[in-house]
From Swiss-Prot:
GO terms for cellular component: chloroplast thylakoid membrane; photosystem I; photosystem II. Chlorophyll b 4 binds at residues 150, 161. Chlorophyll a 4 binds at residue 204. Photoregulated by reversible phosphorylation of its threonine residues. InterPro entries: Chloro_AB-bd_pln, Chloroa_b-bind. Belongs to the light-harvesting chlorophyll a/b-binding (LHC) protein family. Chlorophyll a 6 binds at residues 233, 242. The N-terminus of the protein extends into the stroma where it is involved with adhesion of granal membranes and post-translational modifications; both are believed to mediate the distribution of excitation energy between photosystems I and II. The chain crosses the membrane at residues 89-109, 137-157, 207-227. Chlorophyll b 3 binds at residues 142, 158. This is Chlorophyll a-b binding protein of LHCII type I, chloroplastic. The keyword Metal-binding applies. It comes from Dunaliella tertiolecta (Green alga). Chlorophyll a 5 binds at residues 200, 218.
């Protein structure tokens, strides 16, 4: 009898250990960022509840959709694609806006014009706009021609992507997260790491989209780049602040 009890106890212990081992192997990202137990942000008018169609299957789903924009699965899929593409463009744009101004102010790197909107405005100057400051690369003098080329080249690339590319070209890759040759560093090889990186990408992409909007507004209101605006604010926060700039702003002046 004692031996039977000992064997039963050992079996129960093994079952508990096996269950704990299985729980330990559940990816952290799967619990923290996905599924019903994920972190949620229930914003205004959410009635403290998550819509049933937001199951936590996709990265960046925090359970808030007051307007019901994601209720239709096809619309949801389209919005996911649009958001991710714009997020990636915003990440690149924010980097391109900040880097030249930072390098110019704090590293002494010489640019023809480090402020992002002033650099683009050089196309209206008599000398035109030289890409990367080098006239031998692209010397643009017509805004209409530049826009036309941009629309044609980017339109063709976007149409090619939206239509799934050519037949047989990278058919086995995901359209939003292709990986493979597009991940030469192998950052997405580990499933748990990949799941977490997708969440980080969309979170930072959303921040970048808001940042770019802020950069545009700053450029219109203050006529300065974001780095200079931050420098001015830190030097005198009571004078150089958003409220003061907004109250002094006159469109067209």
């Amino acid at each position: 009898m004692a031996a039977l009890i000992a064997r039963s106890g050992l079996k129960a212990l093994n079952i508990r250990q096996t269950r704990q081992q299985r729980m330990a192997t559940v990816p952290r990202a799967a619990v923290e960022f996905y599924g019903p137990d994920r972190a949620k942000f229930l914003g205004p008018f959410s009635e403290n509840d998550t819509p049933e169609y937001l199951t936590g299957e996709f990265p960046g789903d925090y359970g808030w959709d007051t307007a019901g924009l994601s209720a239709d699965p096809q619309t949801f899929a389209r919005y996911r694609e649009i958001e991710l593409i714009h997020a990636r463009w915003a990440l690149l744009g924010a980097l391109g806006i900040l880097t030249p101004e930072l390098l110019s102010q704090y590293a002494g790197v010489q640019f023809g014009e480090p402020v992002w909107f002033k650099a683009g405005a050089q196309i209206f100057a008599d000398g035109g706009l030289n890409y990367l400051g080098n006239e031998s690369l692209i010397h643009a003098q017509s805004i209409i021609a530049t826009l036309a080329v941009q629309v044609v080249l980017m339109g063709l690339a976007e149409a090619y992507r939206a239509n799934g590319g050519s037949e047989g070209f990278l058919d086995d890759l995901d359209t939003l997260y292709p990986g493979g040759p597009f991940d030469p560093l192998g950052l997405a090889d580990d499933p748990d790491t990949f799941a977490e990186l997708k969440v980080k990408e969309i979170k930072n992409g959303r921040l970048a989209m808001f940042s770019c909007l802020g950069f545009f507004v700053q450029a219109i209101v203050t006529g300065k780049g974001p780095v200079q605006n931050l420098t001015d604010h830190l030097a005198d926060p009571t004078v150089n602040k958003a409220f003061a700039s907004a109250t002094k702003f006159t469109p067209g002046v």
